[in-house]
């Protein structure tokens, strides 16, 4: 990925791919795409209070992981959130 790719606007195929990923993740986690979108928006809102983030590079996934208490697999949220700048903590 080149430096200029960072500033490229997402095309319709990229948007469709992101929507498909969201649908697959929500299916695995047994929650609707609408709930997944609400979770994503809430995470963005809370984190944005403390730092400036790159919402285009944001990647939130719900996957299954093995439980530490031998209860089988449990859902887990993984978030990759690029930080542009930290906000002043004196607000």
From Swiss-Prot:
Q: Which UniProt keywords apply?
A: Cell cycle, Cell division
Keyword field contains Transcription: no
- Keyword Cell division among record annotations: yes
InterPro entries assigned to the protein according to its UniProt record, in alphabetical order: MinE, MinE_sf
- Signal sequence region: none
Q: Which domain of life does this protein belong to?
A: Bacteria
One Gene Ontology term of the biological-process aspect is: cell division
Function of the molecule: Prevents the cell division inhibition by proteins MinC and MinD at internal division sites while permitting inhibition at polar sites. This ensures cell division at the proper site by restricting the formation of a division septum at the midpoint of the long axis of the cell.
Similarity annotation: Belongs to the MinE family.
The protein here is known as Cell division topological specificity factor
Task: Name the source organism.
Answer: Lachnospira eligens (strain ATCC 27750 / DSM 3376 / VPI C15-48 / C15-B4)
The major lineage groups are: Bacteria, Bacillati, Bacillota, Clostridia, Lachnospirales
